[in-house]
Amino acid sequence: MRIDQSIINEIKDKTDILDLVSEYVKLEKRGRNYIGLCPFHDEKTPSFTVSEDKQICHCFGCKKGGNVFQFTQEIKDISFVEAVKELGDRVNVAVDIEATQSNSNVQIASDDLQMIEMHELIQEFYYYALTKTVEGEQALTYLQERGFTDALIKERGIGFAPDSSHFCHDFLQKKGYDIELAYEAGLLSRNEENFSYYDRFRNRIMFPLKNAQGRIVGYSGRTYTGQEPKYLNSPETPIFQKRKLLYNLDKARKSIRKLDEIVLLEGFMDVIKSDTAGLKNVVATMGTQLSDEHITFIRKLTSNITLMFDGDFAGSEATLKTGQHLLQQGLNVFVIQLPSGMDPDEYIGKYGNDAFTTFVKNDKKSFAHYKVSILKDEIAHNDLSYERYLKELSHDISLMKSSILQQKAINDVAPFFNVSPEQLANEIQFNQAPANYYPEDEYGGYDEYGGYIEPEPIGMAQFDNLSRREKAERAFLKHLMRDKDTFLNYYESVDKDNFTNQHFKYVFEVLHDFYAENDQYNISDAVQYVNSNELRETLISLEQYNLNGEPYENEIDDYVNVINEKGQETIESLNHKLREATRIGDVELQKYYLQQIVAKNKERM
């Protein structure tokens, strides 16, 4: 789907970024700009800046920002099209969406919307059946006995599917919906012998399952009579994909951002009870393991995740497996260990809301501390396990991003191995495996475990540490940003592959795409051409970098010559690569680059 560019431009021109951001951030004027606490991460010192002149915002802490569309996308976790539509409504500009591909693609989008509409429409009748009918009385009593108040039932949209094979079927048919589409949406099942349709959910308490935008895309039907299965969920559909959905994310997102932490539970019933008790940053998967898509969503909100699974053997095993994976993905992982045999719902039922929130606040351990406490008996009595887990825990602690949290974990873990914190710290340093060499892709590289590493963002502070060649690349790009004629005059003069700084290389390509559609460079428009926070950071930093007046004669040509230097690499470049090889621990590469530097120095003598 595509929105006409003229509409996008009109909405952008009518939306003042200062007014928009002020709805979410308390801003104070500092010079020509405005500054406030970043809405995307927790901070005590303001680092979020808004430029009224350039109509952009930027956080120097988490690197997020952009123009009005990108700010709206990030703050509401929505797509670009949704952001344009929302801002269009804000400034009374009608958004005309046209198809850019085939009519079938438009039909797919239309079908998805109808599936959501069916789910939301039937929810009203499920709620009515639970709260207003005789048939729903037993299910309602069941909920009330388990602490569900009328207000909570209404807030969560909980309902009841009557014990009828055609309640949902007949209702949707009367409303004019395609029954085959209702089947594809997961609301109906089908008899494969005669292809007749019937209700998937019968005689069950119905819990709506929502996507990140708060739209109902599926259901979980819970039995209250002992029938199996205990929970019957919607099947995988175009709008309901378990690997992409986290229960309660729509409600918890704001608290997750504010607290800079997400708490992962095992089931949605635990989430509802925990949220009611006052723990607002809680989510759960839909009965599946945490997927890479889930982790991607979580990364957008916070780098801190706390696991609070059931206090049984299965919960412990799941905590160890999930925590290990999250740690290797670069997240700070913590664990809340519930008493044996209890889940959050049971803990709240036994001890109450206040005791639960106090417990959660005071009983949070690092993943390394939790892991060693689980394995302590084996460590104490099995020398082979002692050595194995010492290496494992050393590695786990080395993966932690915060040096403060690392030291805390060292202090907590060391006693389990009967060593001092200093000895454990030395062991961590000793056992850090040298990284294997993984070639960098266009945006970054890979660590020794094959994990993706994003490139270092080029912020203003880092501009002071650029090599001679990178400084030439920076100045060259800055001149190209001045006007389209300069860009056209010099675009063919350099080979993009000669850029040593990968961020600058892609800015060069962005400028090509930008000037193909625009005559005058504007940072607020240019940031729409990038999807990466790192590249957006580079564009904004280049915008803030000032050249000294007009270029002197042949100045730009001099930059071109530096960028296009042929032959062997400069010593400066080789030194840079040697430092990188040292950083990743590749001994062979270190030897190679050192030999090149020695040879280069001999040539100079």
From Swiss-Prot:
Mg(2+) 2 binds at residues 310, 312. One of its GO terms (biological process) is DNA replication, synthesis of primer. Its EC number is 2.7.7.101. Binds 1 zinc ion per monomer. A zinc finger (CHC2-type) spans 38-62. Pfam families: DnaB, DnaG_cat_HB, DNAG_N, Toprim_2, Zn_ribbon_DnaG. One of its GO terms (cellular component) is cytoplasm. GO terms for molecular function: ATP binding; DNA binding; DNA helicase activity; DNA-directed RNA polymerase activity; zinc ion binding. Keywords: DNA replication, DNA-binding, DNA-directed RNA polymerase, Magnesium, Metal-binding, Nucleotidyltransferase, Primosome, Transcription, Transferase, Zinc, Zinc-finger. Its cofactor is Zn(2+); Mg(2+). Residues 260-341 form the Toprim domain. It catalyses: ssDNA + n NTP = ssDNA/pppN(pN)n-1 hybrid + (n-1) diphosphate. Transmembrane segments: none annotated. Mg(2+) 1 binds at residues 266, 310. RNA polymerase that catalyzes the synthesis of short RNA molecules used as primers for DNA polymerase during DNA replication. This is DNA primase. The gene is dnaG.
